[in-house]
From Swiss-Prot:
GO terms for cellular component: cytosolic small ribosomal subunit
Ribosomal protein among keywords: yes
Statement: the UniProt record of this protein carries the keyword Ribonucleoprotein: yes
Any GO MF annotation of the entry: RNA binding
Protein family per UniProt: Belongs to the universal ribosomal protein uS9 family.
Record keywords: Ribonucleoprotein, Ribosomal protein
Protein name according to UniProt: Small ribosomal subunit protein uS9
Gene source species: Methylobacterium radiotolerans (strain ATCC 27329 / DSM 1819 / JCM 2831 / NBRC 15690 / NCIMB 10815 / 0-1)
Cited SUPFAM superfamilies: Ribosomal protein S5 domain 2-like
Any single biological process term in GO: translation
PANTHER family noted in UniProt: RIBOSOMAL PROTEIN S9, SMALL RIBOSOMAL SUBUNIT PROTEIN US9M
InterPro entries recorded: Ribosomal_Su5_D2-typ_SF, Ribosomal_uS9, Ribosomal_uS9_bac/plastid, Ribosomal_uS9_CS, Ribsml_uS5_D2-typ_fold_subgr
Protein origin, superkingdom: Bacteria
């Protein structure tokens, strides 16, 4: 901040100019050469790479339809949540490659990546998705096993006599 030497300096500093550091960030659309939005999502050990483009709602996961990859309806519901919050069901074609972890972690990773990709395609969706917590990386991972114990916290069986 500049030092004020006179009343004129004070008047110049109070002209209403806004400090750029205090302004709200402006989010712009981020698309690749094919007009797709790309984002990565993570959950536990799973990492999902998600591409979205305008279409009729086709969801492909690891080159397979979503109905065959996520056979359990609960996992498909997790995947659909960001689209329902945004009101964009069946408006985007979604292509996903996901690796690592189990099916539940992979579904959470796809949801995280899809939420981020939606905000890259339509920045005005950031507020409702952030309010629901879909843009936040779930940091909970498996606690490591400790030596001298059977698992992370479980002790070996103890016999008194």
């Amino acid at each position: 901040m500049a030092t004020l030497q006179s009343l004129a300096d004070l008047n110049r500093s109070n002209t209403g100019a806004v400090d750029p550091a205090n302004e709200a960030p402006v989010h712009v659309q981020k698309l690749d050469a094919q007009g797709r939005a790309y984002a990565t999502g993570k959950r536990k050990d799973a990492v999902a790479r998600v591409w979205i483009k305008p279409g009729n709602g086709t969801v492909t996961i690891n080159k397979r339809p979503v109905e065959t990859y996520f056979a359990r309806p609960v996992l498909r519901m997790i995947l659909r949540q960001p689209l329902e919050i945004a009101g964009r069901v069946d408006q985007y074609d979604i292509t996903v490659t996901v690796a690592g972890g189990g099916l539940s972690g992979q579904a959470g990773a796809v949801r995280h990546g899809l939420s981020k990709a939606l905000t890259y395609y339509e920045p005005e969706l950031r507020a409702p998705l952030k309010r629901e917590g879909f843009l936040t990386r779930d940091a909970r991972v498996v606690e490591r096993k400790k030596y001298g114990r059977k698992k992370a916290r479980r002790s070996f069986q103890f016999s008194k006599r």
